[in-house]
């Protein structure tokens, strides 16, 4: 079965596209732009939220989105309800990172090198603030409230829920 311009692929977070504006990103942008289908995705806990934030918020099918690659790759913002082909979709991406037993390290702290060395020696996974971990991985109170208001408009009944994590 061939996918067409009428088709959507939904990715439930950790897409990996928005990580760094490098040759890999450029390659994927060109590749996805040539596909007939549209990719819709919600944030995961492993996204570069600074990079995502560079794209303007827009309205699309009743909710807020960011067009990452024109009309081919579209980020569905948290707490939004979208009407697509006669069905309602509630998007709520994000999650708490589980691979941070070694901590969330900040290069700006004076003991960064020592913290990193300790985590490396203990073989504990860690993330680095604004490089491999962003506080925006978790929803804000505003996003939670907006999601509740949007669900209330639908009497808390939507056809599909698109999360990243259900735990």
Predicted stretch roles:
Residues 1-84:
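Core catalytic region of metal-dependent phosphoesterases/phosphodiesterases
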């Amino acid at each position: 079965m061939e996918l067409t311009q009428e088709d959507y692929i939904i990715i439930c977070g950790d897409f990996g596209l928005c990580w760094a504006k490098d040759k890999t990103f450029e390659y994927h942008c060109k590749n996805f732009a040539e596909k007939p289908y549209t990719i819709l995705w919600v944030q995961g806990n492993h996204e570069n939220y600074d990079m995502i934030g560079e794209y303007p918020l827009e309205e699309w099918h009743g909710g807020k989105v960011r067009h990452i690659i024109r009309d081919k790759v579209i980020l569905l913002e948290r707490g939004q309800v979208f009407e697509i082909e006669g069905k309602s979709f509630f998007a709520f991406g994000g999650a708490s990172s589980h691979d941070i037993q070694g901590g969330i390290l900040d290069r700006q702290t004076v003991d960064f090198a020592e913290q990193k060395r300790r985590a490396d020696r203990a073989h504990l996974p860690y993330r680095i603030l604004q490089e491999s971990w962003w506080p925006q991985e978790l929803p804000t109170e505003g996003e939670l409230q907006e999601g509740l208001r949007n669900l209330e408009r639908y009497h808390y009944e939507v056809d599909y829920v698109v999360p990243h994590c259900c735990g």
